[in-house]
């Protein structure tokens, strides 16, 4: 652990995982360049933002790359390795080797909105929110069906609660805007309203589910008609 930015000076690689906001990340990378050596890799854990755009704020954009882990990191072994337009080939190669040394499975991805997983998996969250918004069924029924019938370890609303709407909703908005407001990526007003209400998920103690004592509480099933 470090106490100040200056403590990062001897590092060979710095992985950023701050708020999913382009300007915040660009500002941080610019500051990091004033601290670390010129051969230090500056890497972002962004799940949706352009590595090229983040690196553009840097004096040495060729040493920047993307290194996107999935939550929970100890269980989710895939990590996306992303090359920016001006990124040097050796950066991606170093990140690929590092991921393997960490026991993860690296996958090289192009610098496109959402990369691979958050692009391919958009429908898992957005369609689940749309189903609930249209009144087709309750959110916990969607989760139960996706776990029992489709074999997912987490239903979409459990996943939203685990990640936190303060992370998930900005990612939805980012991908929607980066694809020029493609309708199939449109975020849900349900997520926006719950984010405004502070119902973030596990981290706030209440999201789609309640978490008394940190444990997920499933809604009571409706009574069976006599």
Where are these regions (language model features)?
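NAD(P)-dependent Rossmann-like dehydrogenase/reductase catalytic/cofactor-binding core
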Residues: 100-111, 133-134, 139-226
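Flexible helical/loop "lid" subdomain adjacent to adenine-nucleotide binding pockets
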Residues: 120-136
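Rossmann-fold dinucleotide-binding core
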Residues: 41-111, 115-119
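Short acidic capping loops at alpha-helix termini that bridge into adjacent secondary structure
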Residues: 10, 38-39, 61-63, 140-141
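Rossmann-like NAD(P)-binding element
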Residues: 1-42, 49
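Structural signal for conserved beta-strand scaffold positions within catalytic alpha/beta enzyme cores
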Residues: 1-3, 65-66, 108, 210
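Hydrophobic packing residues within well-ordered alpha-helices of enzyme cores
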Residues: 32, 54-55, 171
């Amino acid at each position: 652990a470090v106490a100040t930015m200056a403590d990062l000076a001897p590092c060979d690689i710095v992985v950023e995982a701050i708020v999913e906001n382009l300007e915040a990340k660009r500002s941080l990378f610019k500051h990091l360049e004033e601290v670390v050596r010129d051969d230090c890799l500056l890497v972002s854990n962004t799940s949706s933002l352009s590595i090229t755009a983040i690196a553009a704020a840097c004096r040495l954009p060729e040493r920047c790359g993307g290194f996107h882990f999935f939550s929970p990191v100890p269980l989710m072994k895939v990590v996306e390795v992303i090359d920016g337009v001006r990124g040097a080939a050796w950066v991606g190669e170093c990140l690929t080797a590092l991921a393997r040394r960490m026991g993860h499975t690296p996958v090289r991805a192009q610098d496109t909105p959402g990369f691979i997983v958050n692009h391919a998996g958009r429908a898992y969250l957005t369609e689940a929110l749309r189903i609930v918004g249209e009144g087709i069924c309750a959110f916990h029924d969607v989760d139960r069906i996706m776990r029992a019938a489709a074999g997912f370890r987490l239903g979409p609303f459990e996943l939203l609660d685990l990640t936190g709407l303060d992370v998930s909703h900005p990612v939805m908005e980012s991908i929607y805007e980066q694809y020029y407001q493609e309708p199939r990526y449109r975020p849900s007003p349900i997520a926006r309203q719950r984010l405004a209400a502070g119902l973030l998920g596990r981290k706030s103690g209440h999201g789609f589910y309640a978490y008394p004592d940190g444990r997920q509480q499933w809604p009571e099933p409706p009574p069976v008609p006599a």
